[in-house]
């Protein structure tokens, strides 16, 4: 089974066939997997994720033990389920099974019966552009609104 990541979710929105075939590397081979630039971008994404965790301190990280040879999806979902029994909790990398899909969210904040899911994205910008965040009208540029909370 392959997890439904943000990248795969976006891929499915662009083209459901790509999502379907992404499980079969012989049929659909991603030539960008070994691209050093894309690997550096992914590393930047991890940094942004760590920064987001600082915004929600005291959380519990759901992770698979490093000594396992395979990823135990059910164990990760069970850890999340156990933590959600608490009245209030912050969970990093919360894991769920929904209709045979394995899903993770960057940050989950539970306060009583209210649950907030926070997904973090990294976005590059051109530092020479004078209106990256705020436009000439002194308002936030609309293309940045999905990235700000």
Predicted regions located by residue number:
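Charged, glycine-rich intrinsically disordered N-terminal tails and low-complexity linkers that flank
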Residues: 1-60
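Context-gated lysine
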Residues: 2, 6, 10, 18, ...
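Generic alpha-helix structural propensity
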Residues: 4, 43, 47-51, 75, ...
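Sequence-level detector for tyrosine residue identity
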Residues: 20, 28, 51, 56, ...
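Mg2+/Mn2+-dependent nuclease catalytic core
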Residues: 85-149
């Amino acid at each position: 089974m392959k997890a439904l990541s943000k990248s795969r979710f976006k891929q499915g929105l662009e083209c459901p066939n790509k999502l379907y075939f992404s499980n079969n590397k012989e049929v659909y081979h991603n030539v960008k997997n070994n691209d050093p630039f894309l690997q550096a971008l992914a590393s930047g994404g991890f940094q942004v994720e760590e920064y987001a965790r600082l915004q929600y301190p005291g959380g519990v990280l759901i992770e698979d033990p490093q000594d396992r040879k395979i990823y135990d999806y059910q164990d990760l979902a069970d850890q999340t389920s156990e933590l959600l029994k608490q009245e209030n909790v912050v969970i990093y990398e919360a894991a769920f099974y929904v209709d045979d899909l394995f899903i993770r969210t960057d940050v989950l904040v539970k306060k009583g019966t209210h649950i907030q899911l926070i997904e973090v994205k990294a976005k590059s910008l051109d530092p020479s552009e004078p209106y990256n965040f705020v436009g000439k009208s002194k308002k936030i540029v609309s293309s940045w609104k999905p990235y700000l909370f």
